[in-house]
Amino acid sequence: AVGVVAYNGYTNTAKKNAVKTMHSQVIKFIKSEIIKCDMGEDKVMNGNLNCSDRFIANKIGAATQASFEGKFLNPFVSYKENVVAGQAPHQNGTCIIQYNSGGILVSNINTSVGGTLVRVSTCYGETTRLYEEWIVK
């Protein structure tokens, strides 16, 4: 019985670490693809985002989801895609029930100061999450 508890703890930690790595890779992917737009590319994110659309609400989120389709599977819920476009990911630090474990939500919204605010939020436990946001101009 002790071995089962230790094994379950090990696999849970491995799943959390996998989700943290995926979260980081999604952020790096988005930032590097937006830089390509700034350098004059017309389409990025495997052809899923027209650079001229990067300031339109939810376009970056939808393009990111399409780019990662079938590539990152949720280690906690194996039948679910792991990268999902969402309008307001994990608001106020609360993980949405459907994505409590392993879901990476990506959104972008227009800002009053120009540009678009990109948000990447990932839950890897009941209340534990990673969150990063930045403005693309």
Where are these regions (language model features)?
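Amphipathic alpha-helical segments typified by the pilin-like N-terminal helix
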Residues: 1-25
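Generic detector of bulky aromatic hydrophobic side chains
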Residues: 10-11, 15, 29, 40-42, ...
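N-terminal alpha-helical signal peptides/signal-anchor transmembrane segments
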Residues: 22-41
